[in-house]
């Protein structure tokens, strides 16, 4: 849209309420849509510039990748290696990283988050991975144990009081170098020692306030976001325009493709039966 070919903003505001005809209403809506898009673009650019001025942590990444890969029981895909390059570039820079990793379920995003957390550990920094559900936190904890041994922890609403005290003391002292959990991580009694990296998985399921509280528990930490939700490129620029975006567009060997089905309302009962059958089959 060329602004020179459109009506003025004042004219558009009046015409959207009192149009003379359908064409004038169309032009008014088009002009207001342009105004919204322009304001959003300006705000996102201001956020990007502001974050670019923030002093972050310049992590040392030399040799870390080979050490990390040596522990993997599988080979990485070209897409994963490409994202690793981007992570190393961001984390070694003196400004704070703000990156979104987007990819289908099973594309290998988790190992990339583990790699970023591993870089933080090798630099003597803590890292935290917040997820929306306890089941997902438990799954990530299994992965953390592979790379961090007894220096990692799981903190959720189900954590017993005795275990919670042990974990909180370990986080505060720096003995625990990597922790994953749910919103329990942002409670006021959780005090980190030296956080360098904050990771959120499926961040759209957290409120803005929750994500801000987590990031505020450290001073200018690197931020990594993961999402398996398919987001069109244009929409991602609106939702994450202030972030750098990495796309894991390949699947590891042997992984089944992700199939999406639209089920009409009248076939909902059949869908439930199918889900139940599949669930029992994989128990």
Summary of predicted features, one role per range:
Residues 4-72:
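Upstream accessory/linker segments immediately N-terminal to the RecA-like ATPase cores of bacterial MutS
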Residues 1-5, 281-282:
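Conserved small/polar residues in nucleotide/adenosyl-binding loops
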Residues 40, 44-47, 71, 86-90, ...:
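Generic, well-ordered alpha-helical scaffold segments in large soluble proteins
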Residues 62-99:
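Conserved pre-motif I regulatory segment
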Residues 35-38, 65, 69, 84, ...:
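Hydrophobic face of alpha-helices
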